[in-house]
């Protein structure tokens, strides 16, 4: 599969995978750091983690301000103050919102753009979004701003922010930003519901769509001094810690949290990016506070010592990721002295202990680095708000002109080409991974490709190499049962594409049999590439890609402003003015010679092979310095080396893809055939199913969303049934991969999810050809079958998937928590054991037959579709599957146990002996509550968010991931505080006590809260809930969440807003005290890592030196230490504990 991105998805810190490929990547163990969502330019495998500040990772990108080292605006104006403004007035006439016509934008984009260059050299892009303003221009008053409906979007930053989770609908929520395998469970849990809940609820913790800013400094980790590895990343952290004008250490975060905002930063190889968003009313003040990072940050010594620990925790979280390990190993292959070989992360050793030993003053060096490299003429700034361009220009000029310009040239690494032109590169590297996986990655180091952005040669090659249709590499390997997934291309991170080189990688997830034939797999890749080289670039293929990308750009949906500005500030460093918005998406010119030049370098003699497998253990005698990766270096076997060096034959089964029949050509907006409604209405209701429908009349794009939930009571009857269902959905996905791939690349996306209570089918894209894809999916479902070879291949991979989920502390902690709370839930360990006990193909086919025989089907169709067409979708499902209705109505949730009063602790050992990371969650159960109380809980957690981060992370330095969470567990409310820590630094019980200490201090804090501060927070939450949707997908997600949970409260936000308006400070204080008092129901879950502060069962300190995981997947309960022994009730057998508890009634939060 190739990588595809939209304009928003390119953003550095949002490393999401394409929905169509994410579940495959996860199941098959591909470590993807993709930044894709809907489509556009190809993105490769792997996109790897890089250091970031606190909520997301950094990306590595390309270097110079422009490909030719020029400013964006050779012919553009410099922003002026005072009298010079009249000159600009004459240039644009009297319009206060006239944009720059030379900036090419999508016809669907309502925003206006203006480029300015300040007198200090800083370049800025101003974005005015006055859409939905009903003719308003200019500055609105504060009163208007208070009443104005404002927009927002989702935010994926969960490590320090308040979260709202639907536990019943979550998969594994706390995405580890450094863990590329965080989606391993996408095909094995009801992640469809988790994603919906996270998207819908994350919107409530983000900001107004209209107000966001991002600044890119054109310097990154390549500039790290040799004696202080990680200094650039550390500086990115430290500028947040107070400024001369605003000295409070956590002041900026506190200001944003108070006004519904969020912020983040990321360090790249040659760039560093900062971004934030906030309610429009507070945007100017936020800009002023934020600009102080670059004007006069304090960086006091005391803060330095504490923030080193945050950087170190970030590094510790990154260590168990195979993607990060592979990246560090790959970098170590660079020739000596090349910056690709640097340790970008930094840790306590490189930033504190070693400097002290060598009499290096980190504080002084940090300030020197800031003065040398944080210069205004290296910076590109993007601001977006619902203000006029003139207003934004005035603000930016006034605030950001204060950033100093040192006049020094930016460091240039462009002369350091060919970093991997070494004898060690063209070898076979065997690597022992953390997870259970077989994977082969073939990599070539090419000359820098950024200057060819108008042709995008690597995108063209990725399109073909990553194709999954007939004649493709993956199609051939799947037929042999040697491979499960393939990702190819370049991720456009700075690690993969910079001023010194560009990478092209092909990574293949192998089956057990494929591992045994990995040389043949590599040979198949080389045969395909030789076929492409022999044919040469094909204009038909190029034009097909261009047409698809042009369609997507023309009908582009709006995106989250904070992601958008982040992407744009990086684009300003890469593309000329006219291509800022298009340079990363569109194919402009067909130049076969440019494509051919890149293609002809992809030969076996220049390839690096990395083979990941647990079978390599014992064969690898080398160890990478920073991440401890075990590996070995071998020459390519002589017989294969000789074959690859010869004029080998082509494979007749490998050929170019046929013409794509799924590309849309009809973009007509359809007329209504029934009355327009604000919310979905039920247009079909039968014993076999029902259908909800809403015709879009807001976004006016020729796209549609189709969602169906095929509900069956059969799934949850046993752990074996749950596993059979997982196998079924994954084989169905496997069967569809080849025939549906053309639809996927034509922007028609689909996803099949093995939900807790049924099969979830999601389809979206241009409505013209969408019915073809939907019918294809239902046809394959109706005619489901599997060969013994495919069954064996899928079950073996599923064992690895379950294992890889369980060895992550955060996902094991969730599994344990939900196993305690949800009655009759089958845990991941139960599923793993059922799979290990053995299941047959016959049992699968029998299960599928029974599953399809009796169902209730519930659907939602929204977008550019008529009601008649919508009903046809449901009719097709019913007619094709020909099933009987369910005998009785089936709840789509679990029953939840009622926790006894008191503090209960379940403490278990992590399953990865090489992982120091621990996860500590303290949960308070509330019970069956009303919608009003649910909203009050949201408000509580919103108040809790910033002080929680400040106390537990900033001051106590307990860990990198620290956050409070609202929890909705099958309709039962609660809240929790989670800290990710390390056993090399803290005992989990110490962390638990610190969480309790925080909660006690928080009680005092809210008691002393002023009415003004309380009302400010209420207003902020109301604003977030009032925000209009940015694009149709957000509205669909929110409505689908109501359908799939069978709550149907489509105007939920309006009810929550009304509830918020009725709250008083005493409501908040009393609610919190009631849940913290003597009768509180408290559950602590500890997953304990390996390190000197944690003990083994025999009382000896545990060690994290091992690189292995437990082969027997079972919970190891740990005793409570004297620290908590007097105040807690230990849980040492979950089943025994829960069988004694009462069950709460099924409950839905609808009143």
UniProtKB/Swiss-Prot annotation:
Coiled-coil zones: none
What Gene Ontology cellular-component terms does the record carry? cell surface; cytosol; dendrite; mitochondrial matrix
Q: Name one GO biological process term.
A: negative regulation of cold-induced thermogenesis
What is the top EC class of this enzyme, as a single word? hydrolase
Active site positions: 236 (proton acceptor)
**What reaction is this protein's catalytic activity?**
Hydrolysis of polypeptides, preferably at -Xaa-|-Arg-Lys-, and less commonly at -Arg-|-Arg-Xaa-, in which Xaa is not Arg or Lys
Phosphoserine PTM sites in chain numbering: 86, 94, 96
Question: How cofactor binds (record note)?
Answer: Binds 1 zinc ion per subunit.
Q: Which domain of life does the protein's organism represent?
A: Eukaryota
Would you identify the family this protein belongs to, as annotated?
Belongs to the peptidase M16 family.
According to its UniProt entry, this protein's organism is Homo sapiens (Human)
The cofactor named in the record is: Zn(2+)
Task: Describe, from its UniProt entry, the tissues in which this protein is expressed.
Answer: Primarily in adult heart, skeletal muscle, and testis and at much lower levels in other tissues.
Name this polypeptide is given: Nardilysin
Which EC number(s) are documented for this chain?
3.4.24.61
* Gene Ontology molecular functions: endopeptidase activator activity; epidermal growth factor binding; metal ion binding; metalloendopeptidase activity
Q: Which UniProt keywords apply?
A: Cell projection, Hydrolase, Metal-binding, Metalloprotease, Mitochondrion, Phosphoprotein, Protease, Signal, Zinc
């Amino acid at each position: 599969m190739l990588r595809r991105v939209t304009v928003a998805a390119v953003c550095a810190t949002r490393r999401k995978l394409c929905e169509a490929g994410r579940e495959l990547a996860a199941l098959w163990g591909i470590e993807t750091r993709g930044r894709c969502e809907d489509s556009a330019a190809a993105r490769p495998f792997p996109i790897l983690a890089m250091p970031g500040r606190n909520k997301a990772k950094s990306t590595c990108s390309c270097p110079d301000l422009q490909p030719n080292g020029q400013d964006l605006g050779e012919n553009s104006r410099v922003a002026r103050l005072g009298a010079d403004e009249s000159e600009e007035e004459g240039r644009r006439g009297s319009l206060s919102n006239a944009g720059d016509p030379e900036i090419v934008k999508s016809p669907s984009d309502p925003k206006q753009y203006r480029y300015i260059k300040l007198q200090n050299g800083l370049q800025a892009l101003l974005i005015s979004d006055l859409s939905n303003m009903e003719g308003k221009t200019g500055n609105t008053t504060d009163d208007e701003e208070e009443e104005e409906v404002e927009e927002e979007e989702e935010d994926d930053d969960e490590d320090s922010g308040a979260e709202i989770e639907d536990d019943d609908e979550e998969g594994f929520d706390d995405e580890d930003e450094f863990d590329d395998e965080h989606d391993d469970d996408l095909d094995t849990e009801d992640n469809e519901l988790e994603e919906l809940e996270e998207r819908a609820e994350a919107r409530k913790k983000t900001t107004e769509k209209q107000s966001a800013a991002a600044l890119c400094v054109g310097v990154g980790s390549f500039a790290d001094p040799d004696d202080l590895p990680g200094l650039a990343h550390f500086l990115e952290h430290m500028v947040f810690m107070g400024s001369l004008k605003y000295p409070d250490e956590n002041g900026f975060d506190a200001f944003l949290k108070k006004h519904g905002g969020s912020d983040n930063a990321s360090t790249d190889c040659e760039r560093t990016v900062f971004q934030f968003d906030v309610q429009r009313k507070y945007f100017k003040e936020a800009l002023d506070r934020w600009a102080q990072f670059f004007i006069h940050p304090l960086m006091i010594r005391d803060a330095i010592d504490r923030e080193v620990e945050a950087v170190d925790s970030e590094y510790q979280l990154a260590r168990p990721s195979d993607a990060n390990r592979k990246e560090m190993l790959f970098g170590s292959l660079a020739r000596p002295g090349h910056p690709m070989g640097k340790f970008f992360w930094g840790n306590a050793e490189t930033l504190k202990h070693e400097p002290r030993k060598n009499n290096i003053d980190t504080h002084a060096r940090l300030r020197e680095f800031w003065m040398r490299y944080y210069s205004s003429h290296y910076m590109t700034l993007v601001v977006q708000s619902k203000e006029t361009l003139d207003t934004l220009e005035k603000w930016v000029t006034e605030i950001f002109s204060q950033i100093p310009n040192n006049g020094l040239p930016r460091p240039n690494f462009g002369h350091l080409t060919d970093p991997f032109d070494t004898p060690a590169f063209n070898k076979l590297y065997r690597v022992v991974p953390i997870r259970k996986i077989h994977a082969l990655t073939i990599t070539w180091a090419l000359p820098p490709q950024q200057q060819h952005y108008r042709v995008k040669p690597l995108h063209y090659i990725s399109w073909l190499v990553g194709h999954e249709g007939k004649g493709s590499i993956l199609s051939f390997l799947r037929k042999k049962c040697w491979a499960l997934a393939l990702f190819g291309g370049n991720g456009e991170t700075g690690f993969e594409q910079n001023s010194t080189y560009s990478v092209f990688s092909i990574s293949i997830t192998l089956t057990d049999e494929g591992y045994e034939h990995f040389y043949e797999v590599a040979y198949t890749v080389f045969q395909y590439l030789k076929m492409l080289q022999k044919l040469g670039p094909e204009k038909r293929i190029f034009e097909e890609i261009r047409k698809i990308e042009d369609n997507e750009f023309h009908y582009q949906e709006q995106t989250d402003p904070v992601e958008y500005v982040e992407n744009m500030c990086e684009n300003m460093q890469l593309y000329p003015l006219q291509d800022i918005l298009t340079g990363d998406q569109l194919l402009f010119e067909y130049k076969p010679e440019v494509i051919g030049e890149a293609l002809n370098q992809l030969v076996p003699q220049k390839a690096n092979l990395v083979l990941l497998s647990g079978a390599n253990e014992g064969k690898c005698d080398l160890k990478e310095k920073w991440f401890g990766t075990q590996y070995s270096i071998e020459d390519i076997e002589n017989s294969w080396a000789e074959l690859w060096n010869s004029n080998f034959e082509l494979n007749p089964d490998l050929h170019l893809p046929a013409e794509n029949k799924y590309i849309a050509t009809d973009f007509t907006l359809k007329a209504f055939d029934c009355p327009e409604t604000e919310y979905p209405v039920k247009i079909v209701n039968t014993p076999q199913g029902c259908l909800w429908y809403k015709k879009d009349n807001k976004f006016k794009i020729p796209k549609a969303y189709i969602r169906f939930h095929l509900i069956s009571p059969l799934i949850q009857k046993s752990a074996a049934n749950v596993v059979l269902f997982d196998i079924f959905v994954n084989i169905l996905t496997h069967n569809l991969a080849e025939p549906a791939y053309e639809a996927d690349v034509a922007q028609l996306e689909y996803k099949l999810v093995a939900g807790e209570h049924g099969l979830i089918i999601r389809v979206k894209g241009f409505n013209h050809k969408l019915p073809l894809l939907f019918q294809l999916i239902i046809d394959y479902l109706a005619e489901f079958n599997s060969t013994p070879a495919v069954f064996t291949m899928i079950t073996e991979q599923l064992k690895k998937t379950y294992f890889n989920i369980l060895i992550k502390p955060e996902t094991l902690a969730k599994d344990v928590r939900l196993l305690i709370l949800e009655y009759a839930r089958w845990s991941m360990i139960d599923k793993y054991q059922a799979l290990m006990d053995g299941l047959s193909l016959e049992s699968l086919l029998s299960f599928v037959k029974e599953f399809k025989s009796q169902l209730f089907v519930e659907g939602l169709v929204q977008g550019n579709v008529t009601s008649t067409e919508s009903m046809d979708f449901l009719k097709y499902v019913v007619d094709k599957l020909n099933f009987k209705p369910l005998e009785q109505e089936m709840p789509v949730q679990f029953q939840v146990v009622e926790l006894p009063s008191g503090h209960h602790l379940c403490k278990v050992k992590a399953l990865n002996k090489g992982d120091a990371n621990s996860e500590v969650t303290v949960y308070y159960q509330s019970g069956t509550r009303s919608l009003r109380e649910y909203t009050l809980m949201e408000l509580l957690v919103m108040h809790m968010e910033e002080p929680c981060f400040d106390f537990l992370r900033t001051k106590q330095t307990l860990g990198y991931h620290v956050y409070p969470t609202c929890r909705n567990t099958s309709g039962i409310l609660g809240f929790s505080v989670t800290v990710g820590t390390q056993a090399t630094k803290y005992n989990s019980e110490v962390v638990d006590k610190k969480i309790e200490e925080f909660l006690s201090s928080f009680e005092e804090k809210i008691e002393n809260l002023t009415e003004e501060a309380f009302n400010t927070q209420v207003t902020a939450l109301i604003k977030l809930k009032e925000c209009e949707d940015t694009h149709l997908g957000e509205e669909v997600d929110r409505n689908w969440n109501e359908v799939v949970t069978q709550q149907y409260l489509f105007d939920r936000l309006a009810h929550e807003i009304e509830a918020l308006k009725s709250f008083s400070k005493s409501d908040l204080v009393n609610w919190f005290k009631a849940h913290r008092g003597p009768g509180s129901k408290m559950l602590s879950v500890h997953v304990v890592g390996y390190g000197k502060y944690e003990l083994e069962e025999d009382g000896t300190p545990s060690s994290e030196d091992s690189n292995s995981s437990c082969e027997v997947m079972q919970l190891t309960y740990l005793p409570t230490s004297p620290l908590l022994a007097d105040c807690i009730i230990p849980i040492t057998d979950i089943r025994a504990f829960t069988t004694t508890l009462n069950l709460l009634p099924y409950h839905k939060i609808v009143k």
